[in-house]
């Protein structure tokens, strides 16, 4: 298991603080999803629990390293949300049990809380007391994916460390090596997944990627035949909201193409289809189309029990009218 290249610098920065004996006992990492924060914390924890670290690296040979590699270290506590997808006050009670007992291996104890956004209000209040005066050689790693929803008092108890989406050029280089796909395909997968290299890799290797290519081919064909209802079976079959996003991305790209923003296209592997929309429809029509599709997506996700096929049939007929199909 290797650390992703964009995480090497954050890893070195954090481990150096432990080397200098200046590390805070609780680190709250604010990060977008899909860049591997859990792996970063695992590698830092492995270094902390290593019996014979070599500089910034763990030795990979000692008993501590072997236990970590087997995901079986008794002093490494990875807490995930309970059945209701929340951390309750019971979770905090269990954390307290772990940290106020002696280390099983005689070294550090590590608590990893995978998503602070899942903490209930009562759990946060209880956890604040735990963070205030933890036992010696107890380290906390917390992850927050929603910057704005972050609890201010919890922030004040921790050292905040921010991670960002890697530079597109670096992500693209990594993705091409990992997937052996063409440059345009990798770039498209990255941009559809908001720059996340891990989500892009998963997407480009999945059936959903093939579904996307087939969907666009069917969409192009339906325009040639002046019958948008041809795509109804594909759009209702599964992942309807994802396919609405694909339509909107494509229409946005067509507007970008009109303004010569070719370097910023999301679907750089669908130039022919983008040109078709850009050459044949005014931007006002494309904009109206996007708005109606977004409204359709809103109804689909917010009205319980709605007839999906009926709603999408209606939307396709509305779209034909907007596009002035004869």
UniProtKB/Swiss-Prot annotation:
<protein>
    <recommendedName>
        <fullName>DNA polymerase III subunit delta'</fullName>
        <ecNumber>2.7.7.7</ecNumber>
    </recommendedName>
</protein>
<comment type="subunit">
    <text>DNA polymerase III contains a core (composed of alpha, epsilon and theta chains) that associates with a tau subunit. This core dimerizes to form the POLIII' complex. PolIII' associates with the gamma complex (composed of gamma, delta, delta', psi and chi chains) and with the beta chain to form the complete DNA polymerase III complex.</text>
</comment>
<dbReference type="InterPro" id="IPR048731">
    <property type="entry name" value="HolB_lid-gammaproteobact"/>
</dbReference>
<comment type="function">
    <text>DNA polymerase III is a complex, multichain enzyme responsible for most of the replicative synthesis in bacteria. This DNA polymerase also exhibits 3' to 5' exonuclease activity.</text>
</comment>
<dbReference type="InterPro" id="IPR027417">
    <property type="entry name" value="P-loop_NTPase"/>
</dbReference>
<dbReference type="GO" id="GO:0006261">
    <property type="term" value="P:DNA-templated DNA replication"/>
</dbReference>
<dbReference type="Pfam" id="PF09115">
    <property type="entry name" value="DNApol3-delta_C"/>
</dbReference>
<keyword id="KW-0808">Transferase</keyword>
<dbReference type="InterPro" id="IPR008921">
    <property type="entry name" value="DNA_pol3_clamp-load_cplx_C"/>
</dbReference>
<keyword id="KW-0548">Nucleotidyltransferase</keyword>
<dbReference type="GO" id="GO:0003677">
    <property type="term" value="F:DNA binding"/>
</dbReference>
<dbReference type="Pfam" id="PF21500">
    <property type="entry name" value="HolB_lid"/>
</dbReference>
<keyword id="KW-0239">DNA-directed DNA polymerase</keyword>
<dbReference type="InterPro" id="IPR015199">
    <property type="entry name" value="DNA_pol_III_delta_C"/>
</dbReference>
<dbReference type="InterPro" id="IPR050238">
    <property type="entry name" value="DNA_Rep/Repair_Clamp_Loader"/>
</dbReference>
<dbReference type="GO" id="GO:0003887">
    <property type="term" value="F:DNA-directed DNA polymerase activity"/>
</dbReference>
<dbReference type="GO" id="GO:0009360">
    <property type="term" value="C:DNA polymerase III complex"/>
</dbReference>
<dbReference type="Pfam" id="PF13177">
    <property type="entry name" value="DNA_pol3_delta2"/>
</dbReference>
<keyword id="KW-0235">DNA replication</keyword>
């Amino acid at each position: 298991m290797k650390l992703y290249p964009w995480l090497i610098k954050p890893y070195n920065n954090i481990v150096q603080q432990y080397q200098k004996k200046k590390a805070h006992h609780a680190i709250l990492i604010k990060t977008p999803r899909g860049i591997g924060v859990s792996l970063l914390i695992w590698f830092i924890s492995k270094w902390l629990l290593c019996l014979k670290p070599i500089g910034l690296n763990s030795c990979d040979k000692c008993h501590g390293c072997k236990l970590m590699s087997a995901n079986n270290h008794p002093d490494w506590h990875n807490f995930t949300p309970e059945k209701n997808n929340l951390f309750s006050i019971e979770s905090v009670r269990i954390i307290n049990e772990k940290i106020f007992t002696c280390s099983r291996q005689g070294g550090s104890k590590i608590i990893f809380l995978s998503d602070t956004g899942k903490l209930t209000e009562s759990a946060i209040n209880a956890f604040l007391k735990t963070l205030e005066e933890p036992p010696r050689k107890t380290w906390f790693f917390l992850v927050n994916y929603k910057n704005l929803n972050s609890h201010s008092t919890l922030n004040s108890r921790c050292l905040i460390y921010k991670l960002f989406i890697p530079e597109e050029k670096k992500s693209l280089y990594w993705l091409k090596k990992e997937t052996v796909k063409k440059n345009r395909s990798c770039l498209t997968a990255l941009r559809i997944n908001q720059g996340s290299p891990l989500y892009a890799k998963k997407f480009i290797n999945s059936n959903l990627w093939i579904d996307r290519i087939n969907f666009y081919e069917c969409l192009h064909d339906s325009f040639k035949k002046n019958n948008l209802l041809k795509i109804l079976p594909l759009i209702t079959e599964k992942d309807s909201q994802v396919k609405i996003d694909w339509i909107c991305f494509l229409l946005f790209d067509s507007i970008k193409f009109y303004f010569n923003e070719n370097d910023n296209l999301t679907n750089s592997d669908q130039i022919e289809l983008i040109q078709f929309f850009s050459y044949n429809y005014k931007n006002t029509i494309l904009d109206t189309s996007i708005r109606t599709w977004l409204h359709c997506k809103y109804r689909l996700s917010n009205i319980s029990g709605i007839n999906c096929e009926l709603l999408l049939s209606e939307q396709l007929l509305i779209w034909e009218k907007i596009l002035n199909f004869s």
